[in-house]
Design a protein with these regions (language model features):
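Active-site neighborhood of HAD-like aspartate-dependent phosphohydrolases
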Residues: 10-71
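C-terminal cap/substrate-recognition subdomain and adjoining C-terminal extension
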Residues: 2-17, 21-23, 97, 104-243
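Short, compositionally biased "basic patch" segments
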Residues: 65-92, 156-160
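Generic alpha-helix structural propensity
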Residues: 35-39, 60, 77-78, 90, ...
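Metal-dependent phosphoesterase signature
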Residues: 78-113
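Electropositive phosphate-/nucleotide-binding environments in soluble metabolic enzymes
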Residues: 34, 89, 176-180
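A general structural signal for well-ordered alpha-helical segments in protein cores
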Residues: 40-41, 80, 180
Length: 243
């Protein structure tokens, strides 16, 4: 566990208010929503080293390119193959600690001001905040902890009985339908007294199902009317007038 002074972007977790007439949940995607662009490749470079990471990406150039074009299962499979090439045999505990160091070093400079302001608004209002991402669970856990979120849902990675990662998924990549399923399960586990009001923030087509089930969905993408989430209201610096 690292010991250091809190950075300016870190947020203290705010307990839920007993005075809230109806429970409110805010779900945030991570890459491209809370942060500028993707972070998984940077994370892999930090964990495995730049040379090994670029070499693995070169060997897997064809499936990675096909996955980028086709998205969906092709992208999921290519990502898993890259994880297996770079993470297999590594200590899960060590990768978790390395992830914490990576977040402390890199997250602050990549956070998007509007999204961070909205997350803080939800926390200050006593809402329950959860980060839902296709990034590895151990990585998302650290981000959620640093930002003060109440929950973290990410892609779970398999490990052997000795605690060494295989690099493969434990379940499915947390995007699209899986992201929605995991979020629904998390809501059910909270045992709210009534169905909560849901705010959801995303930036890509992998977030569409999550936004579709939200009471208040927001598009945090940079493409605006050209993006895949153009039907949804844009995230602005002004707090919403509801909830």
């Amino acid at each position: 566990m690292l010991t250091r002074r809190p950075k300016a972007w870190e947020t203290s977790r705010v307990p839920l208010s007993d005075e809230t007439p109806k429970p409110v949940v805010a779900a945030f995607d991570l890459d491209g929503t809370l942060t500028e662009g993707g972070s998984v490749f940077r994370w892999l470079r930090w964990i495995a080293g730049a040379r090994r990471t670029y070499a693995a990406a070169l060997r897997l150039a064809v499936p990675l390119t096909v996955g980028a074009v086709r998205s969906g299962r092709a992208a999921d499979n290519a990502k898993e193959r890259l994880f297996m090439a770079l993470l297999a045999g590594r200590s899960e505990a060590q990768v978790t600690e390395d992830s914490r160091e990576f977040i402390l070093e890199h997250l602050g400079g990549r956070l998007r001001p509007k999204a961070l302001a909205r997350l803080r608004w939800h926390l200050e209002a006593g809402h329950d905040v959860v980060i839902v991402s296709a990034s590895p669970q151990m990585y998302v856990n650290v981000v959620a902890d640093q930002l003060g979120a109440h929950g973290a849902l990410g892609t779970r990675l398999a490990a052997d009985p000795l605690g060494h990662l295989t690099g493969g998924y434990l379940g499915r990549n947390c995007r699209g339908a899986e992201k929605m399923r995991r979020f629904n399960d998390w809501i059910s586990e909270r045992r709210y007294p009534e169905e909560p009001i849901v705010f959801a923030y995303g930036n890509s087509r992998g977030d569409r199902r999550l936004l579709r089930l939200a009471t208040h969905p927001f598009n945090a993408g940079k493409l605006g009317r050209l993006g895949s989430l153009r039907r949804y209201p844009r995230l602005t610096s002004e707090p919403p007038t509801t909830a």
